[in-house]
């Protein structure tokens, strides 16, 4: 039996893609082993959203080549899709494939293994408006409790800092039938929570309108919830302007749809939002957040913020700090701006010094910690349903509640992958303490 090892960098969508490829290889008779163990094939699923992601992708590729000179090295994902010539130039890479036609990954790998080609087997495909969603199955052979199901691919937003539309192509969506089928497989495999994810999740179904199919993210969520036995459904990141009122109503009424929305802000300064080509200003974002909280009062709203975007002054950053406080985010993911070749922002004047970016990120992180503690404090005294995932020690278990907060309770590993009501009794560092109710 041939062995294959995977290494995944980047986002949840990449993780879902890797899980799908693992499933394809297992179905073809391969054994999946940890990346540090001997294998016939090493596959690196890459990331280019930041310079750090791209640099680490190169490091992992080089490590795979250096440590396993007789094995096949396969590179897939956003790096070969956006810079195939760079990946081709890495000595020792045998196969490259972008973000499309990964259903053929075993065929390509076996062709390379059979013939031990002296040149790279290159299958990076250009994506056009006619590119269809690649309905790969989901990998189900893990010991995890939550599964990520990719239901949407591609982005047409073209924010000025972002390379992802070039890496992931145009909008395309998984069919409702496929969503029901894949959620059914996950439920049968024992997963208690399914997280619906995409590159531009709020645009689910948008491109299908030209085929006469009028579906939205609301319909995708309803499809997932319609599967017998599904216990929890959670949404991945989506734009605030794409949150439908009926989706909020569903979240308020349907206990299985978790009370958590990740709404990327990126900046709290209107001047910077315009320069970023974001689809809202701070006034509209505030209105949307208020509407969400009016319909779902106990919702947790998390976000992404970029600091040090070209032209961001100290005054602009101070505006973002104050706006973040006003929004009361449960958690912020903070990113120093990373210049990406080929994007408009990379050519903008007034690039911000790296030291200034780091200093601003640290200041915003302090605000994030304050807001997170406020969110934790507001949960004390409540009863939450917790999906237990792993043991902290021999006497305590850790899990995730609806608002995407970590909860630790006295308990043993028998609680793993079960859902139980927990009375929240206190806070320790950045997580909640509780007792089984």
List each language-model region with its residue ranges.
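Terminal RNA-binding accessory module
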Residues: 347-437
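Glycine-centered loop/turn positions within well-structured domains
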Residues: 103, 157, 169, 202, ...
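Proteins enriched for Cys/Gly/acidic motifs involved in redox and nucleic-acid/cofactor modification
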Residues: 1-204, 216, 246, 257, ...
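Alpha-helix N-cap/loop-to-helix initiation residues
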Residues: 14, 50-53, 80, 240, ...
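Short glycine-enriched, charge-decorated loop/helix-capping segments at active-site entrances
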Residues: 48-49, 168, 208-212, 274-280, ...
């Amino acid at each position: 039996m041939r062995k294959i090892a995977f290494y995944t960098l980047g986002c949840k969508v990449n993780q879902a893609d890797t899980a799908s490829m693992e499933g394809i290889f297992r179905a073809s008779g391969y054994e999946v082993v940890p990346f540090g163990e001997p294998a016939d094939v090493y596959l690196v699923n890459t990331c280019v959203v930041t310079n750090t992601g791209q640099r680490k992708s190169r490091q992992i590729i080089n490590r795979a080549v250096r440590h396993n000179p007789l094995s096949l090295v396969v590179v897939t994902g956003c790096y070969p899709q956006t810079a195939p010539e760079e990946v081709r130039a890495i000595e020792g890479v045998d196969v490259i494939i972008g973000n499309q036609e990964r259903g053929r990954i075993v065929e390509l790998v076996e062709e390379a293994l059979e013939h031990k080609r002296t040149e790279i087997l290159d299958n990076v495909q250009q994506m056009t408006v006619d590119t269809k969603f690649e309905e790969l199955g989901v990998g189900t052979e893990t010991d995890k409790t939550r599964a990520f199901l990719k239901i949407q691919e591609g982005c047409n937003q073209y924010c000025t800092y972002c390379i992802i539309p070039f890496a992931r192509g145009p909008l395309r969506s998984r069919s409702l039938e496929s969503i029901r089928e894949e959620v059914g497989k996950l439920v049968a495999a024992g997963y208690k929570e399914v997280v619906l994810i995409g590159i531009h999740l709020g645009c689910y179904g948008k491109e299908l309108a030209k085929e006469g199919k009028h579906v939205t993210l609301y319909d995708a969520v309803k499809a997932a919830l319609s599967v017998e036995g599904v216990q929890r459904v959670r949404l991945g990141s989506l734009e605030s302007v794409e949150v439908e009122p009926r989706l909020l109503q569903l979240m308020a009424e349907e206990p299985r749809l978790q009370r958590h929305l990740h709404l990327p802000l990126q900046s709290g300064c209107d001047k910077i939002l315009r320069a970023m080509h974001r689809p809202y200003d701070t006034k509209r974002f505030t209105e949307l957040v208020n509407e969400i909280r009016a319909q779902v009062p106990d919702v947790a709203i998390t976000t992404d913020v970029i600091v040090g975007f070209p032209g961001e002054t100290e005054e602009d950053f101070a505006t973002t700090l104050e706006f973040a406080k006003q929004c009361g985010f449960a958690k912020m993911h903070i990113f120093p701006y990373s210049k990406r070749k080929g994007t408009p922002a990379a050519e903008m004047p007034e690039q911000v010094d790296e030291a200034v970016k780091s200093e601003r990120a640290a200041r915003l992180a302090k605000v994030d910690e304050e807001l997170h503690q406020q969110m934790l404090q507001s949960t004390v005294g409540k009863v939450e349903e917790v999906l237990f995932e792993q043991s902290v020690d021999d006497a305590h278990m850790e899990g995730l509640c609806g608002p995407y907060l970590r909860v630790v309770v006295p308990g043993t590993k028998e609680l793993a992958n079960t859902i139980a009501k927990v009375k929240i009794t206190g806070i320790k560092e950045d997580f909640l303490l509780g007792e089984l109710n």
